């Protein structure tokens, strides 16, 4: 949940990390169900049949939506719904993949379908990967299946995604004759 909070900060949801954490603390029942949904999608998916997986996900989503009806503060409701949106928009993650020594990794990556994330700043890339660790965060935005681009260091901790999005837009224009989509 902490990694998703950092991503919410990058997509300009409008709430600071303290308020997001406070919201999760105020609604531990919903936070627990969000965590269960994440685990179902990315850990239990390897153990359940497609039908059982779909059924379990639908039940968890419905439980979360029902619990959200009792959230009285509009901003808290908005944050919790965005968590649900992010989990549903996550295509893949390395969260449950151990390192070479069988230990938990110190970093996580999430591949999103950004078109499933409401209110995302435009233009919306085709794919987005967010990397989180206590030491570093990063984002890779891609506007096509194949795209030119690379890595860039940013000292803009609060909004590096905005910087990268601007660079990708510029790269799309610059390289339109070569490859019609960009990435950073």
Locations of the language-model features?
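Extended, well-ordered protein cores
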Residues: 2-184
């Amino acid at each position: 949940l902490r990694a998703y909070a950092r991503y919410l900060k990058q997509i300009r949801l409008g709430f600071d990390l303290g308020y997001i954490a406070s919201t999760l603390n105020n609604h531990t029942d919903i936070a627990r169900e969000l965590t269960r949904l994440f685990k179902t999608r990315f850990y239990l998916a390897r153990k359940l049949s497609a039908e059982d997986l779909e059924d379990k996900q639908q039940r968890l989503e419905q439980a979360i939506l029902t619990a959200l009806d009792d959230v009285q503060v509009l901003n808290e409701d908005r944050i919790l719904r965005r968590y649900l949106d992010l989990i549903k928009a996550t295509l893949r993650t390395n969260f449950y993949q151990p390192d070479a020594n069988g230990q938990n990794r110190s970093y996580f990556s999430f591949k999103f379908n950004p078109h499933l994330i409401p209110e995302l700043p435009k233009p919306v890339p085709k794919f987005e990967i967010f990397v989180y660790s206590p030491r570093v965060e990063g984002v890779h935005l891609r506007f096509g299946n194949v795209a030119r681009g690379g890595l860039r260091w940013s000292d803009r901790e609060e909004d590096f995604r905005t910087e990268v999005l601007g660079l990708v837009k510029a790269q799309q224009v610059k390289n339109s004759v070569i490859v019609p989509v960009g990435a950073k």
